[in-house]
Each structure stands twice: as structure tokens, then as C-alpha cells.
Amino acid sequence: MKSQSWLVMALICMSFMQICRASSKEDNKIVSLPGQPQVSFQQYAGYITVDEKQQRALFYYFVEAETNPASKPLVLWLNGGPGCSSVGAGAFSEHGPFRPAGGVNLTRNEYSWNKEANILYLESPAGVGFSYSANTSFYDSVNDTITAQDNLVFLQQWFEKFPDYKNRDFFITGESYAGHYVPQLANLIVQSGLKFNLKGIALGNPLLEFSTDMNSEGYYYWSHGLISDSTYQLLTSTCNMSQLWREGIRGSLSPDCEAVNDRISAEIPYEIDEYDVTSDVCVSYGQAQLKVNDHPLRARFRFSKSLQENSSKPVSSPYTQKASENIDLCVQEKTYEYLNFKNVQEALHAQLVGIAKWSSCSQVVNYDRENLEIPTIGVVGSLVSSGIRVLIYSGDQDSVIPFIGSRTLVNNLAKQLGLNATVAYRGWIEDKQVGGWTEVYGDILSFTTIRGGSHLAPFSSPKRSLALFKAFLAGKPLS
């Protein structure tokens, strides 16, 4: 057994040294991804070492803007989880230039965000996607502090590799648990005094304040007809959603919360996609692959007996959507399939270090789930006070982190900061249709909904999300 462990460690170390040798920008240039249509913009992918001693490296995928990349801003994208891949979700399922079409095939995404900016997708923390730590004990205790510090080191090293982007307007964006990752990283940048030209942050359906965000789930369930009046009454009087989450994070439910959990489970079928309550689900790729990609931040624990048992049940995918909107219901499964082809990994300069397969959400990282309870809305406020522009946006069909809680938090923050509404709450129009609702405070803090959008709004509502992204970069209100 000892000799086997030594051999595994030796192989990991050899992989680390091989990866680190390919350290220049040109070494990381992608000639072409298998199955991709012809494009004129450049793509890069590879590793940045964030801890030489522990041999910890983060994987990135970088796509330059379709046109005039030298004049367009740099945008860092972080997916949440905690522990889910920005390459698998952000790049290949949401707003990257390509979408997997089954097998080793890619199609163009006509609403790619690299129409407006140079986009950098980072798999973080180590243990997520292709990112790794040779010292696997790192995976046992990952938290927000470590993640933010590693992300900052990554940026410092990345700018050394891509010096042309050092003085470019810089934005940090993300969704879900990136409501922690993004403001914490932005705050580190501001505090460090590093010469990054940080202009703003954008957060989609973000976790910002545990109780407010979680309790809005219960109201959302009831207001959208997913639970009965009597169950909602039980939620508000016996065990609310934030209490249910807290007990779930700690591994067991009290009798009161057990009863509430059972009622919710009985009334909301598993075939309901909690990331988009109006969505159909992918059936053609089967449930086996979906279990591998299960998103850890789920709206309902359903763990009355054990968390392990809960994870084996069929679940809805955060990447499903209405067939009537011509959205590929099975893009998550196709992404999983595509990124596990060996020739795709070779084209991306990616390696599987200590894992058998790439997965959309980490199977090895033990993230400190109590970090979910750390409020970050105050960090957002300090960024606004520092002159950093902030956009909070919400797909309005998401029950996991509903727009209701986000809107309340932004409104309260504006009051605390003494910011008046410079754009009153109103609908915004995209292509002669209502794209959602928006409100702006002090021309620096904005809240916007994306009508019909899911938890991953750029996937489910790509056209409206691109319109919002374009306005955000320009610093202009939506029309």
C-alpha cells in the first residue's frame, strides 16, 4: 500500500513539472479545439501555479474578443458551487464562444460574451475541473479565504504572462456562490493596492446573505405554486428555509425541520428544475451522467435519512431549459462528454491530475460549507464606497437564490450607503420585448432581473444576458 501511494504521488509530481514547463503565453495558445468552427480570435488555456511548495495550480481558458481585442476590456468569470467549473458552466454551457453539440462537435454561440470583451474563465479552487493540488491534503479544508488568496495570486501571475492586459479595464463577474468569490477577490485587490485597473463587478443570482437569500426560497416556492398554503405556513412558523439549510449543512435535521422537509419533498416533484421552475429536464442522456455532474448548491436537501442517500436520487440539472426557446436541454451532459475526450484535453493543454475524469462540480474538494453563512453584502458595500461599480442581476425563474432576496439586499444596501435611485424601478426592453426590470442607485449600484432567466441566466436567456452584459461594461442603464 505504501509503495502504491508513493507511486501515485510521484506521478502527480511528474505531471506538475511537465505542466509548469509550458509556462509561456505562446505555449498556452490553442491551435484549434476538436470540432470547433473556424474563428478569427485567439484562444489560450493552461495552468498558473499559485503555490510552488504545495504544487497547486489553477487551470484557465481565455478567449480574446471576436473583434478589436486590443481595445476591449478584460473580464474574469468565476462559477460558484462552491466547487463548480467555470470552464464547464460559464465557457461551454453559458456565454463562451462554443457549445458542445454531442460527441467531438462544437457549434458557435451567437450570444457569446467575447463579442464585447476578452473573457478569462478560471477553475477555482484547486480540485475543481482541471485545477489541482499535488498535496491532496489541501482538498480536506478549502474555504473562502484560501480561495480568494489563490485567485489573487493567479491574477498576479496571469498578468505577468499576458502583460498586454495589465492596464486594460478589468471586471470580475460570476454567479451563485461567486457571490462570495467575486467580492472577496475584488476586496483583496483593493486592499492590496495592486495596479489592476478594476472597474466593476457583476454577480448573477448570488449568495450574499444567508438568511435573506435562503428564506426567499420558501416565499418563492409558495408564490409560484410549488408548495401549498399549509406547507408555507409551516415554513414560516416552525422551520424556515435558512434554519433548514443550517441544520442540513451540519448533517442532521431536528424533528420540526424534518417534518417541513418531508412536506416540501412530497409537494415538489424531483422533475421540477429548481434552477428554473418553468423548465423541462434533459432525458435523452439519462440520469447516470447527470449524477456525476450534480450541482452541490441545491435548493432542497431532501436528506431526511442521510446526505449520501440524497445525492443518489435523480435531480434536475442547472443547465436545463424550455425547449420552446431553442435551448439545448442536455448541454451539461454534452459538455461533460466533450471535456472528457483525450484529444480535447490535449488541445486545452489540460491534464487529469489525481482524478479519473473531469467533472462539472468537484468530487474531491471538501469545501467548508459553514462559509455559506458568511455575509458578503457588506463587502459589496465597501467596494461601492471605493468607487467600484456593482451590478447584481437575477434570472427570475430561479428558486435556488431567488431575485426576491437579492432585490431586498440591494435596496437595503443603497439605503445604508445613502444612495438615491438615479434610475427608478422599471422594465427594460430588448428587441421590442420586456427583458426584465432594473433599478440603479447613485449611478454605481444596480439591480436587474432577466425575465425568463434561470439560475444560470446566460444559458437560459442568452440574448437578454448579452444585452445586460454590454450595458454593464459601458456603464449605461438599460433602455
Place the predicted regions along the sequence by residue.
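Terminal and linker regions of secretory-pathway proteins
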Residues: 1-479
